[in-house]
Amino acid sequence: AINPSVNANVGDIQRLPFLGLAAASVLADDAVNIARTDWDNFETSWDFRDLPLLREGTKGATLAESWRNWEAQSLAAIRRMQELETENNRLFIDAYGLAGELSSEVPEEQITLARPSARADVAAFLSYAVGCMMGRYSLEMPGLILANAGDTVAQYLQKVGSSLEQLRFAPDDDGIIPVLDGDWFAD
């Protein structure tokens, strides 16, 4: 027994068999970077910067083309993560002599990166578009621009460092976006 009590001390942990594998560390770093990038593609991430459909390398002439480019990038990231996890498993199986006991293969369905979904990605596009209309996001600079209910277009312009005329897309000044053909507000 490593320690007959319920407690685990530093010495107990140091006695656990572990082979330091530099290659596994590199694989882990790559996997973490892919997972972090995947998470940061969502507005719920604190590090969300912009919509993947609108990025250089993904953005196409149409939304459909942008989505196909995004789908290809997403599927490539999933395949790369699967390769990394399989290689990582192989390293540890070989290091601990478990070749006959375990398989290194990782099925694609076990990769937890977001799968491309036209429905979900168009919903994210619409959410981002509304965010741009309200000044939460900007096409001029990545990241969160305005986050508080009382923020103004003047604060938006100050944060993006442009005048209203220089913007590719300006936020609505009163935060009211008409979606019906009838008049409901004076503006």
Regions found by a protein language model. Give the residues of each.
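Non-catalytic DNA-recognition/assembly elements of restriction-modification systems
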Residues: 18-187
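Basic, amphipathic alpha-helical recognition segments used for DNA target recognition
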Residues: 1-15, 26-34
